[in-house]
Amino acid sequence: YVDAANIRLLKEEIARRFGAMVNNESSVYMVFKGTLNEMLTKVESINNQCFSVMMDYKSPNMPEERASAYAAVSAIEFQKDPARQIAGLELVGDLPAKEELRAEERNMLLEAGIATVIVNANGNTAIEREATTYRKNSAGATDNSYFDMTTTQTAIYMRYSWKERIQQKFQRYKLADDNYEVQPGQKVVTPKVLTGEIIALAEDWLAAGLVEDISSFKNTILTMLDDNDTERLNQLLQPNPMNNLRIVAGKLQFIS
């Protein structure tokens, strides 16, 4: 199911699930098997932050076997911590290729939006980087905001936890403007109250290592009543997702 027609259908289904009226966020894991150029050419048309396509260069596995192993590792580890990279984890049961791509070639795949693997010291296949296929924004400009699957998974979790917090704490509440003085015991919520609640939730995200720079986040929160619907409140949230340590660059010099 990695032909152009099925990929198009998958992208449409993923977009539907991510819609505000569905809220059933999903991720797609697949494998492209072929030469370097074949993989680079095939991934160009996807460009989606929910798709992670893993390389398969001359391995004896069926593509669906490697895709299943990759999806299994991702499902388990991202449930534990959506912001933590899964680089270095082995694909259980996956048979490594006798011939590996060079580091420069694997970097070409990563830049194009293909997740890479290596053969570790134990002779097993291990994830090198869990990249997504998203590389350009809607205007066609290069965009690295969803380079890795960790960013996508963190965003999914934050959206879910925000929705759960609102539904648990403010079910059957009434809505008023900030000028209204809420009396003790009243089930009334205002924009300021919702702003305070999202800040408290962001502190939980911070403690869990999902985001950083809460001070800037607080300053960018927008919470306001809708102009056209008196029973709707709108929020704009711009958290800063946690990054991962992937490269350490150093330079050793003699004392001059």
Please place each PLM-identified region on the residue numbering.
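A glycine-rich, acidic short-motif signal
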Residues: 1-94
